[in-house]
Amino acid sequence: KDMNQLRQFVDNWKDKKIGGILVLGAVQGDKVNLISAVSEEAIKAGYHAGKLLKEVATRCGGNGGGRPDMAQAGGKNPAELGTALDYVSTWVKEQQA
């Protein structure tokens, strides 16, 4: 999926007022597209989409960042996308500590 499709998914998620944290990743050719969104409630609890996605992106050869509510990133190592996405739960737990 390209970044526009991922952004559409995030917009739909936001429109439905689903709380929490959303992180999506997709391989496009030899690149990785990543996007994250954080609900208002989660932002108030200290979560930040840009900080999260920066950490996730580094795990698949990329970088990125963004606002507290939404962030985008790219990566250069599609084989590591699964590992990068697995890190999300670790990051969330670390923020709770």
State where each predicted segment sits.
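Glycine-rich, acidic loop segments that terminate in or are immediately followed by a histidine
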Residues: K1-A97
